[in-house]
């Protein structure tokens, strides 16, 4: 279906259809790429996350079902925030989390931020693909440096930052290690560098009583929560992914003024 440009229904309905020479060539190239270990999402150039069609390239991580945990946690909280909540998706990559939030929280104003201009180009394309341009903007920002003043203040910061440890990087499968962007994977020797940096640099970008929602790797939950608590956050909820692994945390900074 992907290579022919025809829907499954059309192909099944017309058994006299045949693949053109170009379609056969495209499929042959795709099979070779798959046999070389390249992920299917990159071969197709598209993937789905939280019911949204997304463009994906080797400049961004492939959205995974595990990440639905942080998206769902953020959405549940955002639905009960004040009108027109401002939400920052930091280290946004393809924009999958922020776009999922914008698609479900109809009055949310979402900023997709990443250091990589190539990733931001993909995020911007996905914003248009899902017709969310009226409430979503894409900006360049570095999670490891002070939050730029132009960002303003947010009700919530959500992030799936790089969290793979040094040891884990060496053990990643070929399809990840050799194809997905290292800068979106490696989180420092202990995998926690970006959590420390975001809490230090982006807490000032939160409104008083604002929320942070993080995805984290297996076994990192206690350490991520400790980093948050040591910096004035109260842990509100820890949640699991579809494989029953602890995957995300929601925390609140300070208390909202009366």
Region spans (language model):
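Conserved AdoMet
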Residues: 2-76
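Residue-level signal for inorganic ion chemistry
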Residues: 37, 67, 97, 123, ...
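Active-site beta-alpha loop architecture of Rossmann-like, nucleotide-cofactor-dependent enzymes
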Residues: 41, 164-167, 219
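Mobile active-site "lid"/loop adjacent to the S-adenosyl-L-methionine
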Residues: 163-193
